[in-house]
Amino acid sequence: NSRIAFFNDSIRNAIKGSVFESDEKGFVQGNEKYASGIRYGARANTKKYNWLAQAPSQCVTYAACHDNATLYDKIICSTDLANYDERSEDAVKMNKMAGAMINASQGITFMLAGEEMCRTKYGDTNSYKSSPEINKIKWQNLVDYADVISYYKGLIQIKKSFTPLTSMDNTYFDNFTFGGSR
């Protein structure tokens, strides 16, 4: 049924590294072994790529959700760029790159609340039972990460205005190329 979608763990891992290995880097942290995973994920892992989705409507494209580390936490943990509650310009660039990959991909775009403002749960990967202090959204980040929020708004506008990215069928599949290859 094309109306039932799956969370695409393949692109999640390609973007930021495995959620089960805290120090593993994904493509945004410089791990080039995940380049093909980004290419497949951008096309919602459909058609020839041995995944469950037959069309973009069945693929939820994401980098983080309520399970496991936030995107910013995974970047910090795998790179040691800063403490969780510190702004790292390199980590911000990686967060922006992840946002670009999600929004430049076919499928249903999903983002964890606060991803656009580099939300942290201070490395807690199983926070359902953690304190409100860990789980709350730090509203000061609206100011501290205003540039990232603006960037994400732009990404969303681009995606909304570009039909090949919002199409939920395989009409545009063959139009995706990466450096001249598919």
Label for each model-derived stretch:
Residues 138-172:
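Catalytic cores of secreted or luminal carbohydrate-active enzymes
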Residues 77-86, 133-134, 141-145:
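Non-catalytic scaffold segments within catalytic domains of secreted glycoside hydrolases
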Residues 1, 135-138:
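Catalytic cores of eukaryotic secretory-pathway lumenal/extracellular enzymes that build
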Residues 125-126, 141, 175-182:
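Short amphipathic alpha-helical patches
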Residues 58-59, 133, 151:
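Residues that flank catalytic or metal-binding motifs in active/ligand-binding sites
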Residues 1-113, 117, 128, 163-165, ...:
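Conserved alpha/beta catalytic core and glycan-binding cleft of carbohydrate-active enzymes
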Residues 120:
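Core nucleic-acid recognition elements
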Residues 123-133:
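Aromatic- and acidic-residue-enriched segments that line the glycan-binding/catalytic groove
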